[in-house]
């Protein structure tokens, strides 16, 4: 009787275990899979705080040069200037341009520049649902990983437009949200390399930057090309260097 009772208990335990594994635990297993997938997706990035940043990190006087909308026709020239002056920078690329110019992205990564996520095709994120915003961010990062085997740990919303949803999406992906504190408005040149635009870009960078200890400078290397930005960049670098700034990435 004792052995039969023990056998019955053991059989019941097996049945219950099978039932739990096959049915009751499915949500838990799915949740665990989701956690593992998120961990894999965010591997390599430090934890990100909630909120948006506009000032360069680091002690003392620091400046961060950032380039949006690339890679584009002026990217190669910008890389040459940065290399010549041995200056770090951050590129907030767009997914469609990453797919179109993968070799330039690989050059950016190989040279040690930071990669930022500027969405897949630069929409106004405030007009999109949370799911659509997530797809814009994730699709860009997936393309970046496929092309250069890296993940962007920084995110910049197109046009600087964002709501709380974007901040949460970025934080869950261990991506810091970066805006800017110095706007060169170089995009207004629209492909022109005239001295007027070069001087204007330099003037805005110097006027806005000189009053800040930690400026984040916004420039572009859009597909149409920005020759005025390329011409202004050496002057901007020399200006900040002469005023005691240390160049950093975001």
PLM feature segments, named:
Residues 68, 82, 91, 115-118, ...:
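Divalent metal-coordination and catalytic microenvironments
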Residues 81-85, 104-107, 111, 143-147, ...:
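Alpha-helical structural signal in soluble globular domains
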């Amino acid at each position: 009787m004792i052995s039969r009772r023990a056998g019955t208990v053991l059989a019941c335990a097996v049945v219950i275990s099978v039932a739990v594994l096959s049915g009751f635990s499915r949500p838990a297993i799915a949740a665990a899979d989701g956690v593992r997938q998120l961990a894999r997706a965010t591997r390599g990035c430090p934890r990100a705080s909630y909120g948006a940043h506009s000032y360069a990190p680091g002690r003392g006087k620091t400046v961060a040069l950032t380039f949006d909308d690339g890679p584009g026709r002026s990217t190669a020239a910008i890389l040459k200037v940065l290399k010549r002056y041995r200056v770090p920078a951050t590129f907030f690329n767009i997914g469609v341009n990453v797919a179109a110019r993968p070799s330039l992205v690989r050059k950016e990564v190989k040279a040690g520049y930071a990669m930022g996520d500027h969405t897949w095709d630069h929409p106004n994120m405030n007009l999109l649902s949370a799911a659509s915003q997530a797809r814009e961010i994730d699709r860009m990062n997936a393309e970046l990983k496929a092309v250069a085997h890296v993940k962007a740990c920084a995110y910049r919303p197109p046009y600087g437009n964002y709501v709380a949803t974007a901040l949460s999406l970025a934080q869950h992906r261990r991506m810091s949200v970066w805006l800017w504190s110095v706007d060169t408005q170089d995009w207004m040149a629209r492909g022109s390399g005239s001295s007027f635009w070069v001087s204007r870009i330099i003037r805005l960078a110097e006027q806005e930057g000189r009053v800040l200890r930690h400026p984040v400078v916004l420039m572009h290397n859009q597909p149409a090309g920005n020759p005025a930005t390329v011409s202004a960049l050496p002057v901007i670098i020399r200006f900040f260097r002469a005023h005691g700034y240390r160049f950093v990435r975001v």
